[in-house]
Amino acid sequence: MAVLGITVALLVWIATLLLVSIWKQIYRSWNLPPGPFPIPFFGNIFQLDLKDIPKSLTKLAKRFGPVFTLHLGQRRIVVLHGYKAVKEVLLNHKNEFSGRGDIPVFQEYKNKGIIFNNGPTWKDVRRFSLSILRDWGMGKQGNEARIQREAHFLVEELKKTKGQPFDPTFLIGCAPCNVIADILFNKRFDYDDKKCLELMSLFNENFYLLSTPWIQAYNYFSDYLQYLPGSHRKVMKNVSEIRQYTLGKAKEHLKSLDINCPRDVTDCLLIEMEKEKHSQEPMYTMENISVTLADLFFAGTETTSTTLRYGLLILMKYPEIEEKLHEEIDRVIGPSRAPAVRDRMNMPYMDAVVHEIQRFINLVPSNLPHEATRDTVFRGYVIPKGTVVIPTLDSLLFDNYEFPDPETFKPEHFLNENGKFKYSDYFKAFSAGKRVCVGEGLARMELFLLLSAILQHFNLKSLVDPKDIDLSPVTIGFGSIPREFKLCVIPRS
């Protein structure tokens, strides 16, 4: 028995050495950037805090430099950290790294829509979507009027709270939801509409779940975890329900489609589908249209909603900043006229606060994963085709040199010595390059106009002492999720 035990131990030891040797050969087969040595099967997963991956990546960057390699499960990942490396990848090598890295929880939609599409259609679908969004007012007066109209409805709903505590999640969220719904579907919801609240609940829940440790682990080990129960199933179910809604809207539009008189973005996409009716390989299928609409609906609602909600929490933490905003609004806009885009140039403090909110909350800290579209030489390293590339946006937004004391909320980060707004090239909250957020112009306009409208009419009142307000996210992964809170809004007149 003793001899058998020694033999088994020896065989295990030899097998381990062989496995490590093979792993080293694979690991060194490319001239990859440096990084921590991966453990077979697990890779570097134990060197990451799944509750705060961005923080773990920052620590690794201090050790291995601004470009380093990780292995997570079977996935090879190159991380870019810091302004120079991130800008170089997103702008100077935008074509080589324009692919979308796999996100297994969205695997079903890998080659459809805009956000998660890594197939042959994504460039054309994205280009056309940008074009029609601009035609329907992206960055122009059309969207300004939409947002101003919705700001009026939002203010009226806030008045109905009569100074009593309320959770702002869905009440505030209805405003950006209605703006994007009008653009996509020529549709506006009442603030108590059951379907609207149901959709926003799906958006909100998914944004939270995507940022939890389980989903982070699932996206690295989906080959094994897909068979287990877990929140990945809930995310997929929610996505399916959202897509069923957009598919229903597309079918509804198709019944009354006039190709000479499009009513909204949905009609524009359907018209393209009609043009391809006899194509052997149509790009605009009903499925692709429904996923594209779902992408735009989710992104156009949840990101702006979360940013506004986080912004209100921050302003309650710093009432002196809120007071300065009231003074600027009263001086430039007054009590009755609707805030307008043209006011931004005369409201540097509000402009700075809006930018600082986006910088400070770090909404999508690690960016969505990119992918190398071909073998690429980058800074002397060879990054093979198919490698996942993560340009960390938080490494720009929290750069100590550009934003002194970056962990503190300071509108002065975007103001010069004369109190004028100061642009920073480090501000890449919407990413950059080929995969920059298609709704950046709309989101910037919404944040400025909606926040200005709220503060024009109301004082914010916290239910706790401002110094006790916790601004740290409840979870951070795919996104930075603010803690739940209630507040009161007190009419100013």
Swiss-Prot record:
Induction: By ethanol and acetone in the liver and by testosterone in the kidney and adrenal tissues.
Regulation: The omega-1 hydroxylase activity is stimulated by cytochrome b5.
Key words, A-Z: Endoplasmic reticulum, Fatty acid metabolism, Heme, Iron, Lipid metabolism, Membrane, Metal-binding, Microsome, Mitochondrion, Mitochondrion inner membrane, Monooxygenase, NADP, Oxidoreductase
Name of the gene: Cyp2e1
Upper lineage: Eukaryota, Metazoa, Chordata, Craniata, Vertebrata
Catalytic activity: an organic molecule + reduced [NADPH--hemoprotein reductase] + O2 = an alcohol + oxidized [NADPH--hemoprotein reductase] + H2O + H(+); (5Z,8Z,11Z)-eicosatrienoate + reduced [NADPH--hemoprotein reductase] + O2 = 19-hydroxy-(5Z,8Z,11Z)-eicosatrienoate + oxidized [NADPH--hemoprotein reductase] + H2O + H(+); (5Z,8Z,11Z,14Z,17Z)-eicosapentaenoate + reduced [NADPH--hemoprotein reductase] + O2 = 19-hydroxy-(5Z,8Z,11Z,14Z,17Z)-eicosapentaenoate + oxidized [NADPH--hemoprotein reductase] + H2O + H(+); (4Z,7Z,10Z,13Z,16Z,19Z)-docosahexaenoate + reduced [NADPH--hemoprotein reductase] + O2 = 21-hydroxy-(4Z,7Z,10Z,13Z,16Z,19Z)-docosahexaenoate + oxidized [NADPH--hemoprotein reductase] + H2O + H(+)
Organism encoding this protein: Mus musculus
Tissue and organ distribution: Highest level in the liver and to a lesser extent in the kidney, with a higher level in the male kidney than in the female.
Binding positions (substrate): F298, A299, G300, T301, E302, T303
Name assigned to this protein: Cytochrome P450 2E1
Pfam family, one: p450
